């Protein structure tokens, strides 16, 4: 028995020496057992290297293995545990169950126990304790030695969970961490290592469990060889890059001394004859000097090493893709000789996929794929969520949209529209026939409902309350079979293979077996234990998140894309390290885990040694940098970004500054300067997709009259003559010349849309004034939003208007005068109307949930308050209602409002106004129009002038000019007013009396609008007016005169009405001309696009030449009156 160290820095040929040594031993004795032990992740590469080097029959005596495989082989030889090995998912499930049962007894972790990720954290610490050979008993024994009370409670919780885990585990299982412990006990009886020579390569450190196995190997093997990546002759302190390896050497020497193992003369590989860097003096210098202080800078220009500075990560990857594409065409470097590695593979993975696909670069991303976003996994968790969350819309359609539910996409879309429109929620509604909506689709909708609900109902019938774990798993399996999931997946796999998508085919061919394996694991762990569904779905989710799918490279000639920690090959000729930015590489360890650095230090002092703290990990990160920088044989590219995707500045890593110090003349490439399209830049020509993208940039520049090189004409010609690209090129041409301008529609089409007899509403003409295109989409094309089962502001407005209208009808029929109505009768009547209308609402939305029922009561309060205010208004006023919901139209009380266009054609305006009031005074009739508003609508003369508020003045004019209403000598305007429907909250600095509160409510609901500038008329509107009115926008000054704001003379009202008519005529004429321009109005406070539903259709963008707002400058009332006066004079002169 002997032991030999093999020393050498990175690239010195340690792995090569081991394989050569194995070949030499094999030639000396073909029967001798020769064993090479490497980390599990190195095993494939090591086996490949051994097979390539060692040939002949003796190869059968050479074994490449890992500690994990040794356990497997020894157990097969001498027998292992009688217990099954639980996988990591099963381990998480077991820990979840333990924590779930113990959480009330935990001191520190009681709250954290319910947090996502806590189970994984506990699993990690248990794994760590086992690997460092710390038992639960030993951990608990430290409690009396710990002074810090919080740490003591934390260790108490951990040891408690650890004890319960070990007890539960060892009843039936062992986990992967127990395997090495069992191997230590079993290896003595194995003959596998008897007389064998062992080489151990690629380890920088070992766990206490592995050290124990090494002790056994030293006892049984003829010789054990271990490689150590370090400089034998260098004095190494605790901060040196080789410090982790040095600590390993010291620990091994302690064991050798304790076991009295003979130490053979070490092998010291000389870096002067280094094999890996024989073709690059720059890389050899880098390996020797990167961590050397002081150092002598490399005084030559670098050819093999470059720094690439990019604008952002996307540009960073595109730069290397261009270079790889060029190198693959111009040199003998194959794709398999190239690696792209990063410390942030998650952040760069999607970018690499996108860009490498564009550049047609074959690649393999070396990572295990998570499965929790696979459609089958989503389906299973969603089905359980359906039952846990009362058949919620979200869970139901997450399930249906997986594509595995045996329901077509078209059926899912139809069903979703219906469910959203009518608020289908809950098992009861899914079981009952649906009867709302269009009868033409009800039969089809109910067929789909049954198709969806029947398997779910059958499934849920087997899961009531708590169910045994094996029963739940069996029900899940039977459900999946009942909807044909496995058959659908098989069809997908076949489809993916036919499409050449081997990666997806491989993923989906494994997923079914993975799910079955996980369900089996649940049954194994929980057996007949009863579980609630909410816990079952958590258990499943833990398992699904833990599962990782190993992928095999589909071809040999591919670029390797990997995390820096997973690069396992030394056959790389060109290495790109991307994301060399501050905080990314080297990584900054922030998460200390359940045990902080301080906790670990305290435990170490009392004899419990576990994994390194974050400070030690920082030194390990330095060693990782060393290993990474010395991976390549010939070329090295250090790549970093100066900004992220949002333009936020990023700093280069300390690695970049170190390179610039070592290599003062290092080449640094940058894409910060815009590409030159004027020169014949052949570098812009590469693969089809990226070259096409550059061509598009050229075409844009040409469109902007910027000079470009003539050679792009040849590029354009190639794409235009290529059948695969011609259509795409034409589309790009159209896009570049696109202005987003909308042409006028022909009169013929306009007539087909709106008909020859034009009936329009004033509110629609207001919409047209706001944006012609928006009007066209809504009323011409009749585009509709997807109907959602919810109360929208328009729904509420309509509901409240209807209640007030019906209340008005009841008042009229009862014979009451408004000023005679008592508060109690008002409240009872409103309440009864609201309740009845709520019951009659489509889909029963007002009674569909406790929230909506509460909202209905709130509506009652609002309406009662508003109607009581209306009653108070009318008690104070000489104006009394002569009509509610007054309609203008063929079948209405009053005929349509007729306007004549300049062509002689007549347009009929139809609609209704909420209320018309009249005052009889001295053979004159004064009329006022009142419009109820549930929002904060204010009257604006400026908006009236621009045609944005037309309704009140249009209806006032119709009333004043209607012959049927003129039973007196003269009909005059009294005013136009908005009345807000609300239940205002009154705030006061002191206790207010009931009368004061009432006054404050009246102020809050004061009507807004325009009144006739006549003191007597105003005083009739508010007979209690003193100073500022509580109910109308008017003021009586101390001298008895009328305030000037919000009033207009008879002449001004006439001019305003005339101007409104002109606005109506112009809007109608523009509409009939086919003007549907994208021309939204913009005013001081808002624009027409703010709440527009059709922005995704019009794609209005002021960057387009023809896309501009129609800006209206807000005008003061005085300015409007002056403009109207001038208009009137001009009309009179004509």
From Swiss-Prot:
Key word Cell membrane present: no
UniProt-listed InterPro entries = ADDB_N, DNA_helicase_suAddB, P-loop_NTPase, PDDEXK-like_dom_sf, PDDEXK_AddAB-type
Keywords noted in UniProt: 4Fe-4S, ATP-binding, DNA damage, DNA repair, DNA-binding, Exonuclease, Helicase, Hydrolase, Iron, Iron-sulfur, Metal-binding, Nuclease, Nucleotide-binding
Q: Which GO terms describe its molecular function?
A: 4 iron, 4 sulfur cluster binding; 5'-3' exonuclease activity; ATP binding; double-stranded DNA binding; helicase activity; metal ion binding
> What's the record's note on cofactor binding?
Binds 1 [4Fe-4S] cluster.
Which Pfam family, an example, fits this chain? PDDEXK_1
Q: How does it assemble?
A: Heterodimer of AddA and AddB.
Relay the record's extra comment. Despite having conserved helicase domains, this subunit does not have helicase activity.
The record's annotation in HAMAP family points to: AddB_type1 (MF_01452)
What name has this protein been given in UniProt?
A: ATP-dependent helicase/deoxyribonuclease subunit B
Taxonomic source organism = Clostridium novyi (strain NT)
Gene name tied to this protein: addB
